Amino acid sequence: MKTDVIVVGAGLFGSIAAKALAQAGLAVVGVDDSRPGAGSLPAACLMKPSWFSSMGKDKFEPSLELLDRIYGVKDISFKVGLLRATVHWCDPAQILGDEEVPVYREKVTALTRTSSGWAVSLEGREAALEARSVVVAAGVWTSELVRSQALGGLVGRAGVAFRWQDMQLEEQFISPWAPYRQTVGFNISPTEVWVGDGSAIKPENWNQDRQNVSYSRCAQAIDRAGFGDQEAGRVKALYGIRPYIAGVKPCLLEEVEPGLWALTGGAKNGTISAGWAASELVRRIK
């Protein structure tokens, strides 16, 4: 099969890039092996201006424009201490559940340069997929397929968020609990509440005790501590490993070889970074 662009990775970065390229008129397919621990799993896709203002207007304005055009950006009012703040939001279910771009749910085993672009070999499939361009947006696993000096600094940070079923908050909130960390709670759907505490732990140090501490902090923030919600199956833990690259902002977008792109490293600003990267790919892949 031949196409214009193959996007490896169907998390936030890959999904947003694939949809933007498809809407720009390119033929796009995705590949994702549904690996446990993907960084997008706990994502809420909240974008508070103070979190991303250091990107600069030249990056966050094109990002917000693209995200609003292809998904619709909503504004949510949060209580922040004694003040209120408006936070931009895209529904992660809409991004990750979009079906405009077909996705092969298989593992990539090799990327091979061809005379007309790139061949992507898939596990258990004899014929490779072929495209003029390949974007590898595989989070912390991007370096398994792409070599780049910048990817040498790629590390993962584990964290968890929680979704309470059959519940709504009267007041959506952002509350600091430690330097550079905040507990955030909001109504992510008409029947669910999302709460996260910003934990960012080395994956090898993550364990059930860490998750229990995070759960306790989140449950206390919404006055659900001691109600037995976990035992009753009323709350779901969403674990993921976010990709970080020190000194790279807002993320890594690099054409490592002609037609082969590495895209990762969004850290805690994944959605706004993904929007910028997608706008750049639309501009640079013809």
Curated annotation (Swiss-Prot):
Pfam families: DAO. Transmembrane segments: none annotated. It comes from Pseudomonas phage PaMx11. Catalyzes the cleavage of the N-Calpha bond of glycine in Nalpha-GlyT to produce 5-aminomethyl-2'-deoxyuridine (5-NmdU) on DNA as a step in the pathway leading to thymidine hypermodifications in the viral genome. As a final result of the pathway of hypermodification, 5-acetylaminomethyl-2'-deoxyuridine (5-AcNmdU) substitutes for a subset of thymidines in the viral DNA. These modifications probably prevent degradation of viral genome by the host restriction-modification antiviral defense system. Keywords: Host-virus interaction, Inhibition of host innate immune response by virus, Lyase, Restriction-modification system evasion by virus, Viral immunoevasion. This is Flavin-dependent lyase. Gene3D superfamilies: D-Amino Acid Oxidase, subunit A, domain 2, FAD/NAD(P)-binding domain. It catalyses: 5-N(alpha)-glycyl-dTMP in DNA + A + H2O = 5-aminomethyl-dUMP in DNA + glyoxylate + AH2.
